[in-house]
């Protein structure tokens, strides 16, 4: 997988097809490959996933962590953020290891990290320079999201206009989704790519990312650029970007001025 390209400790990825019955032989071969090896430790990183639980049971290992953050022992670790989808499996693993006599690691949970290389970051900088032609700091917008998570054009245009008034000393650019849709009617310079790592390297050279709850938001967080996630439907506490200055905003009780205040507070840190 391109996501784990620079992770030296990942050597084998078994990917089950989404449409099991259309690709039945590939699906069954995935399960056979899973069973062929014996593992020191098996971790289910998505506690609510039925296939995750099933594959954890199916795999050969003495030690299996099922990633359930709803049990009392995980909650008793007194980590108020244990419901976060990225932090939950880490807390669950720490809890499991403590049960088998291994001291719990109490360090801060690390950020998402796609591990961009220096070459990739340099390429991202070059792509940004081709778009803005100056040395100003850059605000990166992503105005799309799937389903009800997607804000209207009216909503985005109001925020965009407020940003252009407030941040005259910043570049404001927009990253486009694969669907090539802009909720601000292409008023800002746009960047389009289908290459996940190229997109991430581009974002890494901007100063702040603002976008709705989406895969692009998590990708921005993994680039280590300050990320502000906008939430109106999904649970902020479960999906918000975290670490450093990253923050999730519940927009159901905050207007455009409030969002600008949050952005200003983050940029001033």
In which residue ranges do the predicted regions lie?
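Catalytic machinery of carbohydrate-active enzymes
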Residues: 1-269
């Amino acid at each position: 997988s391109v996501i784990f390209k620079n992770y030296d400790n990942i050597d084998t990825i078994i990917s089950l097809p989404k449409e099991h019955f259309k690709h039945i032989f590939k699906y069954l071969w995935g399960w056979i490959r899973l069973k062929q090896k014996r593992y020191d430790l098996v971790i289910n990183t998505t506690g609510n996933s039925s296939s995750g639980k099933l594959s954890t049971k199916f795999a050969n290992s003495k030690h299996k962590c099922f990633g359930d953050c709803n049990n009392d022992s995980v909650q008793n670790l007194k980590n108020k953020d244990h419901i976060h989808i990225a932090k939950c499996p880490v807390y669950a693993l720490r809890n499991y290891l403590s049960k088998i006599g291994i001291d719990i690691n109490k360090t801060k949970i690390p950020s998402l990290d796609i591990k961009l290389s220096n070459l990739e970051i340099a390429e991202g900088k070059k792509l940004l320079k081709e778009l803005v032609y100056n040395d100003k700091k850059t605000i990166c917008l992503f105005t799309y999201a799937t389903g009800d998570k997607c804000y209207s054009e009216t909503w985005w245009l109001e925020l965009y206009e407020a940003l252009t008034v407030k941040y005259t000393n910043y570049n404001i650019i927009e990253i486009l989704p694969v669907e090539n849709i802009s909720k601000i009617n292409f008023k800002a310079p746009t960047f389009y790519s289908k290459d996940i790592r190229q997109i991430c390297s581009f974002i890494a050279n901007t100063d702040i990312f603002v976008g709705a709850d989406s895969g692009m938001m998590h990708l921005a967080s993994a680039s280590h650029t300050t990320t502000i996630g906008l939430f109106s439907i999904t649970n902020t506490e479960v999906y918000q970007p975290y670490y450093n200055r990253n923050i999730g905003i519940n927009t159901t009780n905050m207007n455009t001025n409030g969002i600008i205040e949050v952005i200003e507070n983050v940029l001033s840190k």
